[in-house]
Design a protein with these regions (language model features):
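Extended, charged low-complexity regulatory segments
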Residues: 1-205, 209, 213-217
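Conserved motor-region signature of P-loop NTPase helicases/translocases
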Residues: 82, 112, 160-195, 199-273, ...
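A general structural signal for short secondary-structure junctions and capping/turn motifs
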Residues: 85-91, 98-106, 155-159, 166-168, ...
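Conserved helicase motor core of SF1/SF2 NTP-dependent helicases
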Residues: 251, 256, 265-281, 286-290, ...
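Conserved phosphate/pyrophosphate-binding and hydrolysis machinery centered on Walker-type P-loop NTPases
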Residues: 194, 198, 328, 377, ...
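A structural signal for short, well-ordered beta-strand segments and their strand-loop junctions
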Residues: 98-100, 225, 260-262, 679-682
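P-loop NTPase Walker
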Residues: 1-39, 43, 191-310, 669
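Alpha-helical nucleic-acid-binding subdomain
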Residues: 246-478, 484-493, 501, 509
Length: 689
C-alpha cells in the first residue's frame, strides 16, 4: 500500500472524490448561470435585429456584423451546453482510475485521475481529472508499476509508476477502491463482465486492455482491419477509437465526417449511446444494402429484393446452382465481365447524328472527336451532356448571348436521341444476355423488382455509366462492421465511393455465407493504400462453458478465453413445439436476476410463430424483425442473423433443420450471444402454423 504524501488529499481517493464532487457542482452552477446569461444576450440580439433591420446600412455591413455576433453567442452557448452534459455525466462517476507517476528528475509523484472527460476548476487550469484519451492516460492502460513513459505533444516523457488504483463509483458514491499491480486487474474485468447485460452496448473505458488500447490509440495506419473473435470487444474498440480520434483531431475531424456501415437498425440503436456517453456527438449510420436500394430506385428499378429474403430462401430451399450464380455475380470475375461489356458498349449504345442550331453545326466527325477524345474520362451516359454543354458554350461565346431555356430543352432532346437507350436496367440485361445468363423481366420501371443477386452488380454498372454518388465527399473516416458479410464487389464499390481512412472489423466465423470468406486475403490488394490487419483472439463475453461449446460448433480452437465460469450449456430435444413452449414458459416465468434474454431461431417464420405462441401463454415478448429499430429489456425473440453483434444474459437457441446450409453458422452465432446461460433446443416436428 502506498503511504507517501499522506497529508495530500489528492492521494486519498475518497477525500479526492468528495472534493471533486463539490467542485463539479460549483462548475455546473457557474455554467448554468452563464447559459442563462447567454440566452438573454441571444434574445436581446434577436429583438434588436427585428426592431432595427430596416434602418441598417444599405450595404449590409451592420446586418452582417449582427448576424456574426449572434452566431458567435449561439455557438458559445452550445459549447457550454455540451460541457454541462459532460459534467453531469461525470457527477455520477467522476473517475475510475489513478496513476501515481514520478517524472525522471522529480522527488515527488504526481497523481493523475482518469475519467470520461477532462475536468478543471476553471478553464485553462491544470485538470483535476484527465480524459481517458489524454496522452498521460495511456500510463493507466499500458503499464504495470515500474518504469513507464508516454508521448506528450512536446515529446516523450519518462518516469516511474509508483502505484495504480482502480475505482468504482456509482451515483457519486465510492463502491470500491484498491491498488492494482496489473494493467486492468482480471478480477475487476471478470466482475464487470459478470454483470447483467443491458439493452445498450457498454462503454469499456474502465477495462480497456493493453492490446485494445493500442488499436484505439492507433493514428498512424490509414486503414485498420480488425479480425476479432465473437465477444472480443471489436465493435467497442472501433467506437472508442472513433472517440479517441475525435478528441485528438478535433480541429479537423467532426462527428459529421464519420460514417458507420452497420448491419441493421437494431444493431445501430444498440451502439448509438456509446459516443454521447464518452462526451462526443453521435455519428451517422447506414446499412449499405438500404443505401443501394435507395440509389437504384432513382430511375433503375422501383423495388429490390431484401437481403434477408434471399437469406431466408437459401435456408428453406437450398439450391447449389443458385448459390453459385450469386457468388459469381459478386466476384472479381463478374466485375471483369462488366468491364469487358463496357469496353464494347459504346458502339452499340451511340448513334452519332449531325447537330445544327441557328447557324452553327456539329458534324458527326466533330461529335466523335469530342465524345471519344475530349470527354473520354466522363462516364458514358453523362458524356453526351458534356458534349452538349460544350456546344452551347461555343454558340453563346460566338453569338454573344445566352440560349433560351426552350432551346436548351430542344438541344437536350437532340443529344439524348443519339443514345439507343439510357435505361441502365435495359443495358444490364444486354450484359446478362452476352454472359449467357437468364434475363431480368422486361417490364416498366414501376413493376421492376431486382433480385438481390443483381442489386450490387446493377449499382456497379450504374456508377460506371453515370458516375458515383458524391454526397459522401465530406466523410473522412468510414467504419465497416461485419466485414465478413461484404462481397468483393461491395468492397469495390465502397472503395470507389470513399477515399478516406477506414476502420474495418468483423469475424470470419460469423459469416452469413455457406463458406467462410476471409476478406483479409483480398482487402490489402483491393484497397491499395496504407492498410494494417490486426487479429484479436481473446474473447471476453461468454463464460468458459459457453465459449468451449461455441468452439466445438465452429471448429475455431485457438482463442484465448477469460477464466469466468458459469452454468454448463443445456442441450435438449423435444417431440413437439408444445413441449418446447412448456419448457420456455417455465424458464421465463422465473427469470431470476437476468435483465435480458433471447429466444433465437434460424428463420423469420420460426421467430414469428414462437413469439405469437408465447404471447398466447401470457409471456411478455419483444419480437425483433428486419423492420425493428430497437430492442428492450426482457425477452427478445429474433433470428440469428439479426442477433449478430448483440448480447444477452440468457439465450435459448432453437436449432434449425439439418439440411439448412447455414446451420453451423447459425448455431455459432446463437451460442456466442450468451453472457451467462445458454440453452440449445431442438424439436422433432415443425412449429404450429
Amino acid at each position: 500500500m502506498t503511504n507517501y504524501n499522506s497529508n495530500d488529499n489528492r492521494f486519498n481517493g475518497r477525500c479526492f472524490l468528495e472534493d471533486v464532487e463539490i467542485k463539479l457542482q460549483k462548475r455546473l452552477e457557474e455554467i448554468g448561470q452563464s447559459l442563462s446569461d447567454g440566452q438573454k444576450e441571444i434574445d436581446n440580439m434577436q429583438e434588436y435585429y427585428w426592431e432595427n433591420y430596416t434602418e441598417m446600412d444599405e450595404y449590409g455591413y451592420e446586418d452582417y456584423d449582427n448576424q456574426q455576433a449572434l452566431l458567435h453567442q449561439v455557438n458559445a452557448n452550445n459549447e457550454k451546453l455540451q460541457l454541462k452534459h459532460r459534467f453531469e455525466k461525470m457527477l455520477d462517476a467522476p473517475f475510475f482510475g489513478r496513476v501515481d507517476f514520478m517524472y525522471d528528475g522529480d522527488d515527488e509523484p504526481e497523481p493523475f485521475y482518469i475519467g470520461i472527460g477532462n475536468f478543471a476548476e476553471k478553464t485553462g487550469m491544470q485538470p483535476l481529472i484527465y480524459d481517458w484519451r489524454a496522452p498521460v492516460s495511456s500510463l493507466f492502460y499500458d503499464y504495470d508499476k515500474g518504469p513507464a513513459s508516454y508521448e506528450a505533444p512536446a515529446g516523450r516523457l519518462d518516469g516511474e509508476i509508483l502505484s495504480k488504483w482502480q475505482f468504482k463509483i456509482q451515483n457519486g458514491e465510492l463502491v470500491y477502491a484498491f491498488e492494482s499491480d496489473t494493467k486492468i486487474d482480471d478480477d475487476i474485468l471478470k466482475k464487470e463482465l459478470g454483470t447483467n447485460s443491458d439493452v445498450k452496448l457498454k462503454n469499456i473505458v474502465r477495462t480497456i486492455q493493453k492490446e485494445q488500447n493500442a488499436i484505439i490509440r492507433n493514428t498512424k495506419d490509414r486503414i485498420l482491419v480488425i479480425q476479432g473473435a465473437a465477444g472480443s470487444g471489436k465493435t467497442s474498440i472501433a467506437l472508442h477509437r472513433i472517440a479517441y480520434l475525435l478528441y485528438h483531431e478535433r480541429d479537423t475531424l467532426k462527428s459529421s465526417n464519420i460514417l458507420i456501415l452497420s448491419p441493421n437498425s437494431v444493431f445501430a440503436d444498440y451502439i448509438s449511446h456509446i459516443l454521447p456517453e464518452l462526451g462526443e456527438e453521435n455519428i451517422r449510420e447506414m446499412s449499405f444494402d438500404l443505401y443501394a436500394y435507395k440509389e437504384l430506385r432513382k430511375g433503375v428499378a422501383a423495388d429490390c429484393e431484401d437481403r434477408y429474403d434471399q437469406l431466408e430462401r437459401r435456408m428453406k430451399f437450398p439450391d447449389e446452382s443458385a448459390q453459385n450464380r450469386f457468388d459469381w455475380k459478386q466476384s472479381k470475375d463478374f466485375i471483369g465481365e462488366i468491364e469487358g461489356f463496357l469496353a464494347i458498349l459504346e458502339d452499340r449504345l451511340i448513334e452519332f447524328k449531325e447537330i445544327e442550331f441557328r447557324g452553327m453545326t456539329l458534324t458527326e466527325e466533330d461529335l466523335i472527336q469530342l465524345f471519344y477524345y475530349k470527354f473520354t474520362e466522363t462516364p458514358l451516359l453523362k458524356r453526351m451532356d458534356a458534349v452538349k454543354d460544350y456546344f452551347i458554350d461555343s454558340w453563346e461565346t460566338l453569338k454573344g448571348r445566352n440560349i433560351s431555356e426552350d432551346d436548351q430543352e430542344m438541344l437536350q432532346m437532340k443529344f439524348d436521341k443519339m443514345y439507343t437507350t439510357k435505361d441502365i436496367y435495359t443495358i444490364y440485361n444486354w450484359m446478362l444476355d452476352d454472359c449467357g445468363c437468364d434475363l431480368l423481366l422486361e417490364v416498366p420501371y414501376e413493376k421492376r423488382k431486382l433480385p438481390y443477386e443483381d442489386v450490387f452488380p446493377m449499382l456497379y454498372l450504374k456508377y460506371r455509366l453515370s458516375g458515383g454518388n458524391s454526397t459522401h465527399k465530406n466523410i473522412k473516416h468510414l467504419v465497416i462492421d461485419e466485414m465478413q458479410d461484404y462481397t468483393y464487389l461491395q468492397y469495390t464499390i465502397l472503395e470507389s465511393l470513399f477515399h478516406c481512412r477506414m476502420t474495418i472489423l468483423g469475424d470470419r466465423a460469423q459469416t452469413l455465407d455457406t463458406k467462410q470468406q476471409d476478406v483479409l486475403r483480398f482487402l490489402p490488394k483491393l484497397l491499395g493504400r496504407e492498410i494494417r490487419t490486426i487479429e484479436i483472439k481473446k474473447s471476453y463475453r461468454n463464460t468458459l462453458e459457453i465459449a468451449r461449446y461455441a468452439e466445438k460448433v465452429s471448429g475455431v480452437s485457438d482463442l484465448e478465453l477469460l477464466d469466468r465460469h458459469g452454468k454448463e450449456v443445456v442441450e435438449k430435444t423435444f417431440n413437439t413445439d408444445t413441449e418446447l413452449l412448456d419448457e420456455l414458459v417455465c424458464h421465463l416465468k422465473c427469470p431470476g436476476d437476468f435483465e435480458t434474454a433471447a429466444l433465437i431461431t434460424t428463420t423469420e417464420e420460426e421467430a414469428f410463430d414462437l413469439s405469437r405462441l408465447l404471447k398466447l401463454r401470457g409471456i411478455n415478448v419483444s419480437y425483433v424483425d428486419r423492420n425493428s429499430s430497437a430492442f428492450k429489456k426482457g425477452l427478445t425473440v429474433t433470428t440469428f442473423y439479426l442477433a449478430k453483434g448483440l448480447e444477452f444474459d440468457q439465450v435459448f437457441a432453437l436449432r434449425g433443420a439439418k439440411e439448412n446450409p447455414l446451420k453451423n453458422q447459425a448455431e455459432y452465432i446463437c451460442a456466442t450471444r450468451a453472457l451467462h446461460e445458454l440453452y440449445v433446443y431442438e424439436i422433432a416436428d415443425s412449429l404450429s402454423k
